[in-house]
Regions:
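N-terminal type II signal-anchor transmembrane helix
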Residues: 1-52, 823
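N-terminal cofactor/phosphate-binding cores enriched in small/glycine residues
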Residues: 45, 98-99
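Short extracytoplasmic
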Residues: 46-70
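Small-residue helix/turn framework positions
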Residues: 68-90, 113-129, 152-164, 171-183, ...
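Intrinsically disordered, low-complexity segments enriched in small/polar residues
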Residues: 135-143, 525-553, 824
Length: 824
């Protein structure tokens, strides 16, 4: 072995022995002078406090702190002078270990280097007057001029609870420190510290009325801190810590020298879950933001700035960035979304840091909702007490994508495109009380669609739906159904108020124009709305299902008001011109307020209603006929469901009024034997052509007269209709071939019983008599043949001579009528 190495080893051994001897001497000194050492340590600790420090006993610890000497202080209690008032010990610890410098101990002036507290609580308390138990640390007046000898190099806490409670400023911080080790390095400016900690943050309330940040979060960190004594600034550079399982960067400043003291905390987290990010905020803020969720991790930055003063709520700014994520909202999930966002609890400067003045701003938002792509340049959510959302939404999509949203129960789109540009301001969820306002338009082009409840199909259609506040206007509508092209515009006032709350009050006003309409293309409106099963490839979300169900409810309950102007109208064999109609449709009722049309050289006017019952639809109408060609009129309406007299038998112009009730099939055909009511008519320039009942009279009389073409000079009466019966009051008919007096009942099935009185007098003899009463009286003079029309065995009406009993009954009936007329 080299000589120099032997010398080195001997020297090291001697130094080690001296160190051990010195350490043993120090330990022996402590054992021998416990009371004196305890007094000196207590005195050193008391240098910077104004209060009471109580130590039950002191014991030396042999190996702890080697090569220094450590002592254990048992049951240490530190109290301020007003402890009897507030009852909060500043420090209460079962074990406090102090590492003492050996040389200072041997000199009789022990200097504390390290402090370790195990199993205790630190409670920093400030009452409502502003008094704090930390006043115990106010330095006593220095009479020696010497600086304090207490400079701790290391502080260690194990299983210590730390509470900071400020009653006057409504602040409460609570932490359970499993372990904290702080190594301090003193310099001319103050000190630097390296802190390692494992701590559970139970509460971090900057305002106890607002709730806690990072509540019940475990913090694992290796932190570097710097304290500048002159400015009383504690600086925490931005560095990584762990909050539960999330890695975040934490930095900040605590400015204790300012009045009041202030602080800034900065937090950054990359790839953190949205729920984890929310959990770092106060429950109130978290609850407001939890109306949405983000499936994949995102990048978050948060800044908290506040003052340690009465009821101060710190300024909170949270920024985040989302890329290709899924955003869940009250209206359903938004997929493939990317955006930048910021939360700010002071939207308007000087209005305070509170929910009402808080807001969320989202930039460059893009995503897909129910497969509809859309963009929002800037989206605002303000007043988190009662949230208001505002933003301009733009989208271009194929109309077929709407089928999934509306459920395929009302409308089904087969082709076409839509361009959406809407500015929305209002509540976020249906329960919100804020009124919603929408401005902008939706343009629809080249649309093919079906309206299933009415079995209607439209092709190559277009429209512009314009939103103005709470109202909706539908403009430039072109609907092509079959051979019919409709041009429409409409309005739906107060749409946003009534859509969910009271759809029965909704009225959709339509103005409809068309050159020609074939009503067969719209026959589906006659029947009741059909219940259609939803056609969905996939089941949509609950919010979309509710929207679809509500759309069907609105379509069922709302009122549609139509104002129509049509150049030409066709309906089976009916043809008319210049249709003007005012029609209302509500639930299962079609109300014809005022309908007029030119038809067969005259004019028709109708009002009434149709009750949609499905296969059979009941109607009640009042109609007026002015100067209509009677043959065309009967032909157009399929002889009104009867065969007593048909269009082929009639000529002339008719003036009539009708008040009838009946039933139509869902195809618009008259249901036989369902017509009830009355018709008053006046036939001018009339003719009966090949009318079989008249021709049958010729078998009895007037065989030489032309009964195939009978011109009617005057024909006016009222007919009462009762199902399959037409009741004919007494009616005098003047014609070119004969005069007739008719009354009775004509039955469409069985029960025909018509009295026919035929005077043999030639009508031409009375042509020069202008007075109608005189002409009728003279026409019935002379021989009168009394006939009767009854049911034949073959089902047809037959004409026969009246029996003696029939004649007597008719004479009595006539006498009674004359007596009634002569009565005063």
């Amino acid at each position: 072995m080299p000589k120099w190495l032997k010398t080195l080893l001997k020297t090291a051994g001697v130094l080690a022995c001296l160190t051990i001897l010195l350490w043993m001497g120090a330990v022996a000194y402590v054992h021998a002078n416990k009371k004196e050492v305890l007094e000196k340590i207590t005195a050193q600790l008391n240098e910077n406090i104004n209060g009471t420090l109580t130590i039950e006993r002191m014991e030396p610890v042999l190996l702890r702190g080697f090569p220094g000497v450590s002592v254990a202080l048992k049951n240490v209690v530190l109290r301020d002078s007003l402890w009897q008032v507030h009852k909060h010990d500043l420090l209460q610890a079962s074990d406090v270990y102090l590492a003492v410098d050996v040389l200072s101990l041997l000199k009789g002036a022990p200097r504390i280097k390290d402090i370790s507290v195990e199993g205790g609580r630190v409670y920093i308390y400030t009452d409502t007057t502003g008094y704090s138990n930390t006043t115990i640390f106010r330095r006593k007046k220095d009479t020696t001029g010497r600086p304090s000898s207490l400079k701790i190099n290391k502080v260690k806490l194990e299983n210590v609870s730390l509470v900071f409670e400020n009653k006057s400023k409504f602040k409460l911080f609570e932490m359970d420190i499993a372990q904290l080790v702080a190594r301090l390095d003193y310099n001319n400016n103050g000190w630097d510290a390296k802190v390692t900690t494992n701590t559970l943050v139970r509460n971090l309330m900057f305002n106890t009325e607002k709730g806690s940040f990072v509540e019940k979060k475990r913090v694992n960190a290796n932190l570097n801190l710097s304290y500048y004594e002159e400015t009383q600034l504690l600086e925490i550079p931005l560095q990584t810590i762990k909050l539960d399982k999330d890695k975040v960067k934490l930095g900040g400043k605590f400015m204790m020298g300012s009045k009041p003291a202030s602080f800034v905390l900065n937090i950054e987290a990359a790839d953190i879950s949205f729920k984890s990010a929310l959990s770092m905020l106060t429950p109130k803020i978290s609850e407001k933001l939890s109306i949405v969720d983000i499936s994949e991790p995102l990048d978050v930055e948060a800044s908290i700035k506040g003052k340690m003063k009465f009821r101060d709520t710190p300024l909170v700014v949270v920024k985040w960035r989302v890329v290709n994520n899924t955003l869940t909202t009250p209206a359903g999930p938004v997929t493939d979304c990317s955006f930048r966002g910021i939360f700010h609890n002071e939207v308007r400067g000087g209005k305070g840091h509170n929910d009402r003045n808080s807001g969320i701003t989202v930039y460059d938002f893009k995503g897909s909702w129910e497969r509809l792509p859309f963009k929002v340049d800037t989206l605002l959510v303000t007043n988190l007490t009662s949230p208001v959302l505002e933003g301009r939404f733009t989208s271009q999509f194929e109309l077929a994508k709407l089928n999934r949203i509306i459920g395929g129960k009302s409308f089904v789109f087969n082709k076409g495109n839509a361009n959406l540009n809407l500015h929305y301001r209002g509540g976020i969820s249906q329960a919100d009380t804020n009124k919603a306002y929408v401005y902008g338009a939706i343009n629809v082009n080249k649309a093919d669609m079906s309206y299933l409840p009415r079995d209607l199909t439209f092709t190559n259609s277009s429209a512009t739906v314009r939103f103005k506040g709470r109202d909706v206007y539908v403009q430039n509508v072109k609907l092509q159904g079959g051979s019919t092209v409709l041009h429409m515009d409409g309005s739906l006032l107060n749409f946003l108020s009534l859509y969910y709350t009271d759809p029965r009050k909704m009225v959709l006003d339509w103005n409809i124009r068309s050159e020609e309409v074939d009503l067969i293309n719209f026959i589906g409106f006659l029947g009741r709305r059909k219940q259609v099963a939803a056609r969905q490839e996939e089941k949509p979300g609950n919010s979309v299902s509710r929207m679809s169900a509500q759309l069907d409810k609105v379509m069922d309950a709302s009122t549609v008001h139509l104002n129509l102007k049509v150049g030409k109208v066709n309906y089976y064999s009916f043809a008319a011109q210049n249709l003007h109609a005012d029609v209302s449709m509500r639930e299962n009722i079609i109300v014809l307020n005022e309908v007029s049309v030119n038809h067969a050289g005259g004019k028709l006017a109708v009002n009434g209603d149709i009750a949609q019952g499905g296969s059979v639809n009941k109607f009640a109408v009042k109609a007026k006929v002015d100067g209509v060609d009677v043959q065309e009129f009967f032909r157009s309406f399929q002889n009104f469901g009867q065969d007593a007299i048909e269009d082929k038998n009639l000529r002339g112009s008719v003036f009539a009024t009708a008040d009838v009730k009946g039933s139509l099939t869902e195809k618009g055909k008259m249901v036989p034997n369902t017509l009830y009511g009355f018709v008053t008519f006046d036939l001018k320039n009339g003719m009966l052509k090949d009318f079989e009942p008249i021709q049958k009279i010729g078998k009895f009389i007037f065989r030489n007269r032309d009964l195939r073409n009978v011109s009617i000079n005057k024909l006016a009466n009222r007919l009462d209709i009762a199902g399959d019966k037409i009741i004919i009051p007494p009616m005098y008919i003047e014609s070119s071939a004969l005069n007739l007096h008719v009354d009775g009942v004509y039955a469409l099935n069985k029960g025909t019983n018509i009295n026919i009185d035929v005077p043999l007098r030639n009508p031409k003899k009375d042509e020069l008599i202008l007075d109608d009463g005189e002409r009728m009286e003279r026409g019935m003079k002379g021989i009168v043949v009394r006939l009767k029309a009854v049911d034949g065995d073959d089902g047809n009406v037959k004409i026969k001579l009246a029996s003696k009993e029939d004649k007597q009954q008719r004479l009595k009936k006539g006498a009674a009528a004359e007596s009634a007329d002569e009565a005063p």
